[in-house]
Amino acid sequence: MIVRHEPEGGVLSNAVEANGFVFLAGSVADDLSLDIEGQTRQALDYIDTMLARCGTSKSRIVSATVWITDTANMAGYNKVWKAWID
């Protein structure tokens, strides 16, 4: 069975559950005025929310693809990611 988690009136699924797997659409910060650490926290909070909605958590993540627009932001991103992923 496939379960799609779509925003009200949306056409893009934020998350899809299929055969015991959860696939999330791109997760980005809403507040671009934040520094990289703040933006990363905001995106990861959203991921936590979507995973919980699907009945799972970050402890079960198998793979993650991350896009960073400027390598100067890697240290800040990595700091927040490492604290989040435990």
What does each of the following model-derived ranges do?
Residues 1-62, 68-86:
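N-terminal presequence-like segments and the immediate start of the first folded domain
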